[in-house]
Amino acid sequence: MKRFKINIEYMVDKVLYKTNVFETEHFNIKYTALESHIKLDVTPLVPLEKVTFKMTVPYDFRSNDRIFLNGYQSWTECREHFVDDEPITLNLKQQALRLIKPTSPYGDYDFVKYDRRKGCFHGFSYGYVRNIDHFDFFGSLSERFGYTIIRANVPDREIIFERDLEGVTIKNEYTLIDVIHYKGEENQVYDKYFETMNIQKPRVGRTNGYTTWYNYYQNITEDIVTTDLESLSKVDSKIDIFQIDDGYETFVGDWLDPNPAKFPDGMKAVAQRIHDKGYMAGIWIAPF
């Protein structure tokens, strides 16, 4: 991955600038570029607004390659693609429906530009190109500065890394990209990625849980939760976790904004009642 190029756009004093260099009168970029790791940090000399950034790496795709890119969230369809597949996107009818019903809770349609050409795919944080048992694995080491969007662009024979910087004004040193490229068999590349990120192997034992979803779906209230909690506590349920599922929030996605009409005492009070019964309290915040 030593060979790469960058493109950065930004505004200073309402003037738009576009460049592909590492130093201007407005910023300088320091970088680490190794075969398996690239990191780019920008130091602004003035506040940088409306920044967009991408880094492009050449890649020789082969006809029997398979491409996987991690989805935006758990509702995103994630699978391996053939190099000549069409990207998964909205058709014309679905795009028209977006004018009536926003799609923001269901995917990245509102903030990621889709390339509709065959062989053009995108995902978030990590992905790979697989040829039989050999994996070329690409992964971000940090998403604290914004989502890392990875694009596999087969027609142009390149892999592109972007940082989601919408709404960000860069005033201090900022990590534009921090990605690795590991090669090997599946377990090798994933184990090395987890090791690099210091992610320990989970050591959680088996647990049993109750969720409101399959009885009530979104039609839950504080009274319903309290009634079920009382009922469970009177039987030998062997339940470890009592989970409040979808329906407590005002709208899908607003998980920090409980519906006061349905949960007048608030979620903290409900969680305390769950704890008082000896259960761990769970709450649904999917699709993330």
Protein language model regions, located:
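Aromatic-lined carbohydrate-binding/catalytic grooves of carbohydrate-active enzymes
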Residues: 206-288
